[in-house]
């Protein structure tokens, strides 16, 4: 494949970030089709070589988890089993392909072109979010958000209702604030794979996350920035040579945290408030998780989640919730202790990376691998191609840039 065609192919990645939630068509009630529905085919555009062994390992793990869920899970709604299982298998295929593919290398002289497209995407979505927030402040509603919602995979009516009661959230081109923040962090990590400092873009992405009103997004950005500060400056060589710079950068960061502290403290307080989004995402579902880990009938088959969640009577606002907004909890409900052991194994790998990253965290390596488990706390829609794209895109670029560590 020629260089020009290769570049056009990789320029698809920032474009997909703009279109990831735009609905092309609909199959049934719960299967919207978007550009990332065709992600396995799109990955072939970047393919140089594939390890069949790795792909078979990934598919084997997916098949084992599917069999476990079918054999030990209780079925509460058999009509949705096939669709839900297909989504899980699809995610396994996407992750397996990204892990097993050797991607075509992006030549250095083309880095700037791809980065410009990413900068353009960031500028567009953050500017749109700013316009939405301005309209919300001035009018108490958002006709812009309502108009965009008609073209998205899911309705954001609950966000619009939240705004009517005085809330301030934005979604830009995405179906919910948390997914908007998740997309911005994914873009941020994609840009960081190019190994350059982008303070203006960092500031714009942080502004977008704040405009989204996503507490998970704000805390993740703070965590990732603190980690990078620690990796850069908490080693003997850096302390000797860069101590003033380290103190100045930390001071500036802490000023930002102090300014944001009222918001952070309010959202932390919401963890104990039944009916709040924070409570529903983190605290409320713990009773379900505990039941899944301690009872034989605690595992739920694919497609039966709504009925299982509703049976616990946990309120999300004024209504009893029927969904799980926490991906880790969802995995435990579907796979019980397998999800726990796999999560602990993965986090063990990340912790080893952290220990060795002081003074050598090349291109945000630790943050990239930490992004996968952290992203589980943003949404329960983890068995969707849209979520999968946000997770794998930075990895695709890292491999295409030949970053081996």
Regions found by a protein language model. Name each.
Residues 210, 214, 316-354:
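A conserved mid-to-late transmembrane alpha helix and its immediate loop/hinge
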Residues 264, 269-335:
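Long extracytoplasmic/lumenal interhelical loops at the membrane interface
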């Amino acid at each position: 494949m020629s260089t020009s065609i290769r570049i056009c192919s990789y320029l698809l990645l920032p474009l997909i970030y703009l279109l990831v939630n735009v609905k092309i068509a609909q199959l049934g009630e719960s299967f919207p089709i978007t550009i990332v529905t065709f992600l396995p085919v799109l990955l072939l555009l970047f393919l140089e070589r594939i390890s069949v062994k790795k792909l078979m390992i990934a598919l084997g793990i997916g098949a084992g988890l599917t069999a476990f869920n079918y054999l030990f899970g209780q079925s509460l709604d058999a009509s949705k089993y096939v669709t839900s299982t297909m989504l899980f298998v699809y995610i396994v295929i996407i992750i397996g392909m990204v892990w097993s593919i050797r991607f075509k290398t992006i030549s250095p002289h083309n880095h700037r072109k791809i980065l410009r497209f990413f900068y353009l995407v960031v500028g567009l979505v953050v500017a749109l979010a700013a316009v939405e927030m301005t309209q919300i402040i001035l009018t108490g509603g958002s006709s812009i958000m309502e108009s965009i919602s008609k073209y998205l995979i899911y309705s954001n009516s609950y966000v619009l209702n939240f705004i009517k009661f005085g809330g301030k959230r934005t979604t830009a081109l995405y179906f919910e604030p948390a997914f908007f923040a998740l997309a911005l962090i994914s873009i941020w990590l994609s840009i960081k794979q190019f190994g350059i400092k982008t303070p203006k873009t960092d500031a714009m992405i942080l502004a977008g996350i704040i405009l989204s009103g996503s507490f998970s997004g704000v805390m993740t950005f703070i965590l990732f920035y603190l980690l990078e500060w620690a990796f850069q400056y908490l080693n003997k060589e850096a302390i000797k040579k860069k101590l003033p710079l380290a103190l100045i950068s930390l001071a500036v960061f802490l000023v930002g945290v102090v300014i944001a502290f009222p918001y952070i403290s309010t959202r932390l307080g919401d963890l104990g408030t039944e009916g709040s989004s924070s409570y529903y995402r983190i605290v409320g579902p713990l009773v379900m998780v505990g039941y899944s880990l301690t009872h034989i009938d605690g595992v739920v088959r694919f497609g039966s989640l709504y009925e299982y969640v509703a049976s616990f009577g946990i309120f999300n606002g004024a209504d009893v919730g029927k969904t799980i907004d926490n991906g880790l909890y969802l995995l435990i409900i579907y796979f019980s202790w397998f999800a726990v052991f796999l999560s602990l194994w993965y986090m063990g790998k990340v912790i080893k990376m952290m220990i060795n990253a002081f003074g050598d965290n090349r291109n945000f390596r630790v943050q990239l691998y930490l992004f996968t488990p952290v992203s589980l706390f943003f949404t329960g829609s983890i068995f969707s191609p849209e979520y999968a794209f946000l997770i794998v895109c930075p990895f695709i670029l890292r491999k295409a840039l030949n970053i081996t560590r």
